[in-house]
Amino acid sequence: MSFGGLFDGGGGGGMQFPFASGFASSPALSLALDNAGGGIGGRMLGGGAGAGSSAGGAMTRDTEAENDSRSGSDHLDAISAAGEDDVEDAEPSNSRKRKKRYHRHTPQQIQELEALFKECPHPDEKQRAELSRRLSLDARQVKFWFQNRRTQMKTQLERHENALLKQENDKLRAENMTIREAMRSPMCGSCGSPAMLGEVSLEEQHLRIENARLKDELNRVCALATKFLGKPISLLSPPPLLQPHLSLPMPNSSLELAIGGIGGLGSLGTLPGCMNEFAGGVSSPMGTVITPARATGAAIPSLVGNIDRSVFLELAISAMDELVKMAQMDDPLWVPALPGSPSKEVLNFEEYLHSFLPCIGMKPAGYVSEASRESGLVIIDNSLALVETLMDERRWSDMFSCMIAKATVLEEVSTGIAGSRNGALLLMKAELQVLSPLVPIREVTFLRFCKQLAEGAWAVVDVSIDGLVRDHNSGTAPTGGNVKCRRVPSGCVMQDTPNGYCKVTWVEHTEYDEASVHQLYRPLLRSGLAFGARRWLATLQRQCECLAILMSSATVTANDSTAISQEGKRSMLKLARRMTENFCAGVSASSAREWSKLDGATGSIGEDVRVMARKSVSEPGEPPGVVLSAATSVWVPVAPEKLFNFLRDEQLRAEWDILSNGGPMQEMTQIAKGQRDGNSVSLLRASAVSANQSSMLILQETCTDASGSIVVYAPVDIPAMQLVMNGGDSTYVALLPSGFAILPDGPRIGATGYETGGSLLTVAFQILVNNQPTAKLTVESVETVNNLISCTIKKIKTALQCDA
């Protein structure tokens, strides 16, 4: 039986009860009420409490208290007497000693109290009130009964532990005496004659102790390496043949493992042959050379830097085992979801807790869990190409630019075995985002571990290191307004298929603090549509489809009224990607861009509108001056697909876009990024206000998949776009993006299953308020961009007939 927090005031993790049955048959303790005034506690166990009580009276009280404690609950009788009798005894004029009246509990009351105590040793106030009402007891009686029962349990447990320790002590004393007797008359084990013992120096004793410790550590490391490498390692195998100039000295005191180059090359001579595969620059038994681990420029948190890197490896292996099992297991771990649910299956958390040990510790109080699994085919050469993308932080963040605000490799703990990604281990830090100012960024520090499961099959797992630094509050604490988040073993399992595709099974399991998330977005996050496996896999499929089209010789171009070369199309797509990345950075307020929030200078702007400013001096691709960004999110009672088609239609932009000059826009060219309608990059031309004014060009990128959609656009100069369309460098083309992010509003359970009521629309604008970087931001500029957002949202609702 497990009593969580029984002996530590209710706040600890609890302990395992060491006995097969409880202590219900043992005599209960007779405990008194403690009172700060000292007047009540002295009277609870006897008839008098005055200073003149005799020794005989004290003996009588002790005898009575002992008799009163015969039942499992009789130690609460004193509490029943703490009513009106206490008031009478407290009066100074009452010198007559009276015997305390005890109210004993009935067997039924004791049975009910004991039954609840076995289920919950620490009942809350509501449970105590219900029990007192049901048993016709005072609430204080129930409260102090549980207090005394816990004290009794603790005391009896301590007595039992003391008895065990005493037995162990007696046993050690007996062994010590036996050894002393044997040392007085030592005998030779070979011939049986008396032996003469030589003196052993203190230094030799220390060396023997150190040798035993190193041997134990070597056994542990070899067992770990056997599991890591997937092949047995013999402790008696000789080290590989090394060149004379690569001979390695012995360590001074401890076994420093050079996993990922952490321990240094000086310790490799103590390891068995196959363990050299962890080290850098040393030949392995297979004849290959292992690339040494590299140190990154990012600063490693001090508390993380103090952790032994072999602990990282143990955590990564445990997380990998959990990921593979979660990707392969079905019912009862994964059960079918309700009809209409965004996911086909949901995690059975009760079965999960029975199947896996929490490798990063128990879920903190107040956290909620979200777990999802999704499988699908991805257009990619092979699974190894996807592994290379996931293990490179830059390519990973580019692939999921709408979800990853910032990614950094803090340390490359292990580069893998034999120059491959098998066994590669990275310590990373990332900022995950939802394109809305109402959802804080999730900042997480985690390990990313890669393993080859079979030929053409790989797995990449992420796991937070919070469990390793859980005793330090600042070890991986989020910064700024970011939300607290823990990444339970999550990742993907990849398998090559004969038709040129790669089957990917994605598992996402996260624990986070929901208190900082806006009520509007909580259903979305709980359903897994914001950070779940469905969104990761849908984004991966869309991006890989786009890359496949770009790598093909025939890029699909629709409505091509302007001839664009292949180089021009690539340059135009590169510019559109930069535009979308800048748009996402302006919405999420990531630390990747130097945005400053204007919390106290926004005047009458609503709390759901985030306003930020940034000074651009000489950054390529941005106009110099003070840039103002404003974003907000609203609920629109329109299906996400309908809202997306309305916003991307150039013929309908006059209904909401002030850049259209009140008329329809013309699509000059369109580059398709996928087979699904809506994934494209377009160049639009707005109608000229007058004959003397040249028309404006607008670059627009639209993306959509099963998880959501975005529409991003920015005005561009005509000469700059002519250069880009001719294949020129788009790095220095200045633009400030604006646009929309569309997400489903999260499923709600209706009469026939899950139902979706509308869309969550995020509107964001970036405008140049002053072309002088040193200029100060004015209140008028802030109000202007706020009015622009409000007016745009109102026009969209009016056009969709949902402004009521």
Curated annotation (Swiss-Prot):
<dbReference type="Pfam" id="PF01852">
    <property type="entry name" value="START"/>
</dbReference>
<dbReference type="GO" id="GO:0003677">
    <property type="term" value="F:DNA binding"/>
</dbReference>
<keyword id="KW-0371">Homeobox</keyword>
<keyword id="KW-0805">Transcription regulation</keyword>
<feature type="compositionally biased region" description="Basic residues">
    <location>
        <begin position="95"/>
        <end position="106"/>
    </location>
</feature>
<feature type="domain" description="START">
    <location>
        <begin position="305"/>
        <end position="549"/>
    </location>
</feature>
<feature type="coiled-coil region">
    <location>
        <begin position="146"/>
        <end position="223"/>
    </location>
</feature>
<feature type="region of interest" description="Disordered">
    <location>
        <begin position="47"/>
        <end position="106"/>
    </location>
</feature>
<dbReference type="InterPro" id="IPR017970">
    <property type="entry name" value="Homeobox_CS"/>
</dbReference>
<keyword id="KW-0804">Transcription</keyword>
<feature type="compositionally biased region" description="Basic and acidic residues">
    <location>
        <begin position="61"/>
        <end position="77"/>
    </location>
</feature>
<protein>
    <recommendedName>
        <fullName>Homeobox-leucine zipper protein ROC5</fullName>
    </recommendedName>
</protein>
<dbReference type="GO" id="GO:0000981">
    <property type="term" value="F:DNA-binding transcription factor activity, RNA polymerase II-specific"/>
</dbReference>
<dbReference type="Pfam" id="PF00046">
    <property type="entry name" value="Homeodomain"/>
</dbReference>
<comment type="similarity">
    <text>Belongs to the HD-ZIP homeobox family. Class IV subfamily.</text>
</comment>
<dbReference type="InterPro" id="IPR001356">
    <property type="entry name" value="HD"/>
</dbReference>
<comment type="function">
    <text>Probable transcription factor.</text>
</comment>
<dbReference type="GO" id="GO:0005634">
    <property type="term" value="C:nucleus"/>
</dbReference>
<feature type="DNA-binding region" description="Homeobox">
    <location>
        <begin position="98"/>
        <end position="157"/>
    </location>
</feature>
<dbReference type="GO" id="GO:0008289">
    <property type="term" value="F:lipid binding"/>
</dbReference>
<keyword id="KW-0539">Nucleus</keyword>
<dbReference type="InterPro" id="IPR023393">
    <property type="entry name" value="START-like_dom_sf"/>
</dbReference>
<keyword id="KW-0175">Coiled coil</keyword>
<dbReference type="InterPro" id="IPR009057">
    <property type="entry name" value="Homeodomain-like_sf"/>
</dbReference>
<dbReference type="InterPro" id="IPR042160">
    <property type="entry name" value="GLABRA2/ANL2/PDF2/ATML1-like"/>
</dbReference>
<dbReference type="InterPro" id="IPR002913">
    <property type="entry name" value="START_lipid-bd_dom"/>
</dbReference>
<keyword id="KW-0238">DNA-binding</keyword>
